[in-house]
Structure formats: structure tokens, C-alpha cells
Amino acid sequence: MNLLLDTQALLWWLADDPALTPAARTAIRAAGTPVFVSAATAWEISIKQALGKLEAPDNLEAALAASRFQLLPITVAHALAAGRLPRHHDDPFDRILIAQAQYDQLTVVTHDPQFRLYDVAILWA
């Protein structure tokens, strides 16, 4: 299983927050499991930090580099797939994560019930 962390799951992981489910922790820690973080997640965090709506590591780039997570860029194919998704959910960051997960066959680690409205594999965070 290849994982894609949504923003909340990533923040819970980085903060070692007990809100992250044991199943999600086990899957993220599993040796040999590729874990991806989207460029969209970094973008969302930086925007929300600038607005004072979110606390996250001051140097997210260093925190990600210290992890074994792989960075997932946003491609043209991802962007086009996001635009074609049903309009169940209008959050652009979530829509790109859903498109990336579908396109790259990733399981999204999320605590957002809106993701269940899409044809995407989910591991409940």
C-alpha cells in the first residue's frame, strides 16, 4: 500500500499527536511502505500559517526532509484530473489530493469524511 498523507494527518504525525489513529501510525511506520506528501499540502500549510490559522513546524521543508516521506509534485495530469472530479467537495487542496491518489493509485490517510464521497482508497487517520 502506497500512502498519501493529507494535511491533518501530516500535522498529527509531525506533532506526534495521539489523535492520529493507531492503524494510521502503524501503516506510516511500516518498513517498505512508501509515504507521500503532496506539494499541495505544503502550499496549504504555508497559506494557513501566513493567515495565523494553523500551527505547524517553522521549517516544514526540514521536517519533511528529516522524515522518510517522498514529496509528490503536482503534475498537469493531476490538475486536469482534479478539475474532472464530481463537485462533492470544493476544497481545492483536498480535490488535488484526491486526484493524485486516484491517478497514482495511492491510499489517502485522512480524517476528513468528505474524501469518502470519492472513488479513492482511504486509511482513516
PLM regions and their residue ranges:
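Active-site neighborhoods of divalent-metal-dependent phosphate/nucleic-acid chemistry enzymes
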Residues: 57-61, 66-114, 125
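A generic structural signal for short
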Residues: 12-13, 48-49, 85-86, 100
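Short, well-structured N-terminal submotif of metal-dependent ribonuclease cores
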Residues: 1-37, 50-62, 104, 113, ...
